[in-house]
């Protein structure tokens, strides 16, 4: 595996969305279907820095920073999932994206799947990893992080940890990567949230994870897009790592059997932020998969046969 780069070699782009500026990466040729990269919590487009260069030679790559995150504006919002839906919907329309291939992770997956369910004719493929799915009980949440996330979801304690102590950035983020993140990388992830007042999204997201039936509205929304995924023929590319967090090897095997038109790639050792452990494999396999969306052929992936 080559050395994992820490730089962010992309010019900034901004677009006004619902009265706020959203930052995004925009590189690659303008013809053809664009590839839309969606990050989750507590990251930004920086998460895709070593993956986009594999795809950009042949496809337009767009990677926004969700509202309140990265270099995007930080309006005074509650940062419920529905707030992110409104801003992402408006972002896609502001850029005039008629059709897209989605590359999604964490809460970016929930946003992407929810958008795809509502706009199926505009989605040409979905590459996903460590995506948001219903977690029936806390017993299915990784033991090493169970108490921490239960604390995050305890009102006063959670706000103290995430807002005041910045525990999601300083604690949860590095624990969910197999390799040690460098100080340069950590500083990139810290930069948008240096002020406690800007950390509201970091607190809201773990409180909306669909675990043990709560919160009910998010559980219903996630179940709805999971039902759609199990019915839709849209090409899917699922990356998984060992041991994983949201998607274990066993869960990946079940999804490979139950999701139609789904290819899978084993990235090797990985927890939640797979992009930080094996970005070159993820990027190269996405680049190899994209032509298959047009010609419908089978490809032998480095992670094994995928058809």
UniProtKB/Swiss-Prot annotation:
It catalyses: 1-haloalkane + H2O = a halide anion + a primary alcohol + H(+). One of its GO terms (molecular function) is haloalkane dehalogenase activity. InterPro entries: AB_hydrolase_1, AB_hydrolase_fold, AB_hydrolase_sf, Epox_hydrolase-like, Haloalkane_dehalogenase_2. Pathway: Xenobiotic degradation; 1,2-dibromoethane degradation. It is an enzyme of class 3 (hydrolase). The keyword Kinase does not apply. One of its GO terms (cellular component) is membrane. Keywords: Detoxification, Hydrolase. Pfam families: Abhydrolase_1. Its EC number is 3.8.1.5. It comes from the Bacteria. Belongs to the haloalkane dehalogenase family. Type 2 subfamily. Catalyzes hydrolytic cleavage of carbon-halogen bonds in halogenated aliphatic compounds, leading to the formation of the corresponding primary alcohols, halide ions and protons. Has a broad substrate specificity, which includes mono- and di-chlorinated and brominated alkanes. The highest activity was found with 1,2-dibromoethane, whereas low activity was measured with the analog 1,2-dichloroethane. Monomer. This is Haloalkane dehalogenase. It comes from Mycobacterium sp. (strain GP1).
């Amino acid at each position: 595996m080559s050395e994992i780069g820490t730089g962010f070699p992309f010019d900034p782009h901004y677009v006004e969305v619902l009265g706020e500026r959203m930052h995004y990466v925009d590189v690659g040729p303008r013809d053809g279907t664009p590839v839309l990269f969606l990050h989750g919590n507590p990251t930004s487009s920086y998460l895709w820095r070593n993956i986009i260069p594999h795809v950009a030679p042949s496809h337009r790559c767009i990677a926004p920073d969700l509202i309140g995150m990265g270099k995007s504006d930080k309006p005074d919002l509650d940062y419920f999932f529905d707030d992110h839906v409104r801003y992402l919907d408006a972002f896609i329309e502001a850029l005039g994206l008629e059709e897209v291939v989605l590359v999604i992770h964490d809460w970016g997956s929930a946003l992407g799947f929810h958008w795809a369910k509502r706009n199926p004719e505009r989605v040409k493929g979905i590459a996903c990893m460590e995506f948001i799915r219903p977690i029936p009980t806390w017993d299915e949440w990784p033991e090493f992080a169970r108490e921490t996330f239960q604390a995050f979801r305890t009102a006063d304690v959670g706000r103290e940890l995430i807002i005041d102590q910045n525990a999601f950035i300083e604690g949860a983020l590095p624990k969910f990567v197999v390799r040690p993140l460098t100080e340069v990388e950590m500083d990139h992830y810290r930069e948008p949230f240096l002020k406690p007042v800007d950390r509201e999204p970091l607190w809201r997201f773990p409180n909306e994870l669909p675990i043990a039936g709560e919160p009910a509205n998010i559980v219903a929304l996630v179940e709805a897009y999971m039902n759609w995924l199990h019915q839709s023929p849209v090409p899917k590319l699922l990356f998984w790592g060992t041991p994983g967090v949201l998607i274990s090897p066993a869960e990946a095997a079940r999804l490979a059997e139950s999701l139609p038109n789904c290819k899978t790639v084993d990235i090797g050792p990985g927890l939640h932020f797979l992009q930080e452990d094996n970005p070159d494999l993820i990027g190269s396999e996405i680049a190899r998969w994209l032509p298959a969306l047009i010609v419908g052929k089978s490809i032998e992936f480095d992670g094994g046969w995928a058809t």
